[in-house]
């Protein structure tokens, strides 16, 4: 797992799931909202801004995120693959020092919630948000009608502060999860690393193989991948949970006595 700059020290992070959220409203909640797929450099700028502001004010830093990704519900045919599973995102949030995460189940019904109702029902009634950290191009709510201008106008009426964070760019374009997906899929891993701010990470579960590598004196670990975005077939230098010994990874098709399988 690539190293990230964290909000030091790492605290215990509470995780809330479902529409109900926290039973008791958090103290002086400083909130940021997003999917945060990949938890890349631009995401970390938002998340760390929430952590630091909450600590300065003696409040609670909270990330509101969604599962599944809204794109899977709104346009399942064209939905983009995920850079990392939810549990990996939560691990990154914990390293960054967030006090809490609220995972909202994104459904077709939830997608019909207006931007104004999201502010009133989620941010104010449930969280009693005092400050909301957002990117300059942040949009939300049904038909993406909520933007920075609407947020500011509504927040002014509700007594909530909106803190816009300047867009982070690399190579003349905004850093985004979609750019990183494209880089990994095309094998441009050095560029993906620059956008992520850390080494690209793949997630999988070791599964039994045929044992031919072990019989040849070169034991291998076969992975059933949990990552949806994979690099092209090839041989890559890898690290496994920061082990010091060098590793190599083959991504491709493995010949089998009765056919082939992807590895």
What is the predicted function of each stretch?
Residues 81-89, 113-119:
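Glycine-rich, highly charged phosphate/nucleotide-binding loops
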Residues 40, 93, 132, 192, ...:
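Residue-level signal for inorganic ion chemistry
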Residues 22-85:
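N-terminal catalytic cores of NTP/NDP-binding nucleotidyl/phosphoryl-transfer enzymes
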Residues 85-101:
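A glycine-rich helix N-cap at a beta->alpha junction
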Residues 209-263:
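Phosphate/ribose-recognition catalytic cores of enzymes acting on nucleotide-derived substrates
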């Amino acid at each position: 797992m690539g190293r990230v700059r964290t909000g030091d020290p790492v605290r215990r992070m509470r995780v809330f799931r479902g529409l109900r959220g926290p039973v008791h409203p958090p103290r002086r909640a400083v909130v940021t909202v997003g999917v945060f797929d990949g938890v890349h450099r631009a995401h970390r700028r938002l998340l760390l801004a929430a952590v630091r502001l909450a600590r300065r004010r003696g409040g609670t830093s909270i990330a509101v995120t969604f599962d599944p990704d809204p794109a899977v519900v709104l346009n399942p045919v064209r939905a983009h693959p995920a850079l990392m599973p939810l549990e990996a995102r939560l691990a990154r949030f914990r390293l960054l020092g967030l006090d809490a995460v609220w995972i909202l189940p994104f459904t077709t019904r939830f997608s019909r919630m207006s931007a104004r109702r999201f502010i009133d029902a989620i941010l104010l009634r449930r969280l009693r948000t005092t400050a909301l950290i957002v990117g300059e191009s942040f949009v939300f709510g049904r038909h993406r009608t909520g933007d920075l201008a609407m947020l500011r106008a509504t927040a002014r009426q509700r007594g909530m502060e909106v803190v816009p964070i300047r867009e982070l760019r690399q190579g003349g374009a905004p850093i985004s999860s979609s750019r990183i997906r494209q880089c990994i899929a095309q094998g441009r891993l050095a560029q993906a690393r620059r956008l992520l701010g850390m080494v690209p990470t793949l997630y999988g579960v070791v599964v039994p193989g045929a044992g031919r590598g072990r019989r040849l004196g070169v034991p291998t670990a076969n992975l059933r991948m949990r990552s949806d975005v994979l690099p092209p077939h090839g041989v890559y230098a890898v690290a496994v949970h920061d082990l010091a010994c060098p590793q190599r990874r083959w991504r491709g098709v493995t010949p089998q006595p009765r056919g082939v399988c992807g590895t």
